[in-house]
From Swiss-Prot:
Residues 215-238 have a biased composition (Low complexity). Binds the lower part of the 30S subunit head. Binds mRNA in the 70S ribosome, positioning it for translation. The gene is rpsC. InterPro entries: KH_dom, KH_dom-like_a/b, KH_dom_type_2, KH_sf_prok-type, Ribosomal_S3_C_sf, Ribosomal_uS3_bac-typ, Ribosomal_uS3_C, Ribosomal_uS3_CS. Residues 38-106 form the KH type-2 domain. It comes from Cytophaga hutchinsonii (strain ATCC 33406 / DSM 1761 / CIP 103989 / NBRC 15051 / NCIMB 9469 / D465). Belongs to the universal ribosomal protein uS3 family. GO terms for biological process: translation. This is Small ribosomal subunit protein uS3. Part of the 30S ribosomal subunit. Forms a tight complex with proteins S10 and S14. Residues 215-254 are annotated as: Disordered. The keyword RNA-binding applies.
Length: 254
């Protein structure tokens, strides 16, 4: 089952958190569609912002966006001008006050979506797909990932018949729920047609409790920038907790 299902959806509530945090009730469908409109607008407005994830929270009077980006300066704009424009447009869409929190991604090579988008840009520039895949894998493993797999589908290299090719390094334990695996899908529109890109990145195994939304609600009101702790390496195969209270037994005094 782990081989077929979306790795992020499979781990929701275990090591992964939701990207839409609110209660909709009877208006659930309308709010879900509105969330999709918000994300599409922000990504279209800042296509080169290096945005990996947008988490949306809702209250009665306010909509809060938490944007994880590798290029916070591009998202904020000069003197915060870009963020202010985005707030005005989103207020028209939602009809509520909008708050935007911005967190910087220190290691974009560990974000599956950013890796996929990077490969897509190289394919559009007619760089060899094998070279693009190998460079992405080397860069991700160099910054501390335990495994990465990249799969491309389409008319690779301009071939007459579409096919699938993939490269993998390290391990990707898709059946292990405590495994922190990032997954993303991207597309590259080339002169030969559309090429699909799938990326899996294994960051390590998570033991004990974990904050599923570490960056949500931590920033001050308005646009702010901070470091992103979400892609900090978890316990990468470290020792398990001792059972039976072995670590809590007091040493007897002789």
């Amino acid at each position: 089952m782990g081989q077929k299902v979306n790795p992020i959806g499979f781990r929701l509530g275990v090591v992964k958190g939701w990207e839409s945090n609110w209660y909709g009730g009877k208006t659930f469908a309308d709010k879900l569609v509105e969330d999709e409109q918000i994300r599409k607008y922000v990504l279209a407005r800042i296509p080169k912002g290096g945005i990996s994830k947008i988490v949306i929270e809702r209250t009665i009077k306010r909509v809060t966006l938490t944007i994880n980006t590798a290029r916070p300066g591009v998202v904020i704009g000069k003197g915060g001008a870009e963020v202010d424009k985005i707030k005005e447009e989103l207020k028209k869409i939602t009809g509520k006050d909008v708050q935007i929190n911005i967190f910087e991604i220190k290691r974009p090579e560990m974000e599956a979506l950013l890796v996929g988008e990077s490969i897509a840009q190289q394919l559009k520039a007619r760089i060899s797909y094998r070279r693009a895949m190998k460079q992405a894998i080397a860069g991700t493993m160099r910054v501390g990932a335990l495994g990465i797999k990249i799969k491309l589908s389409g008319r690779l290299g301009g071939a007459e018949m579409a096919r699938t090719d993939q490269y993998k390094e390290g391990r990707i334990p898709l059946h292990t729920l405590r495994a922190d695996i990032d997954y993303a899908v991207s597309e590259a529109l080339t002169v030969y047609g559309k090429i699909g890109i799938k990326v899996w990145i294994f960051k390590g195994e998570v033991y004990g409790k974990r904050d599923l939304s570490p960056n949500v609600g931590n920033a001050a009101s308005g646009a702010s920038s901070s470091s992103n702790n979400d892609n900090a390496s978890p316990n990468q195969g470290g020792p398990r907790r001792k059972r039976g209270g072995e670590g809590n037994r007091k040493k007897s005094n002789k």
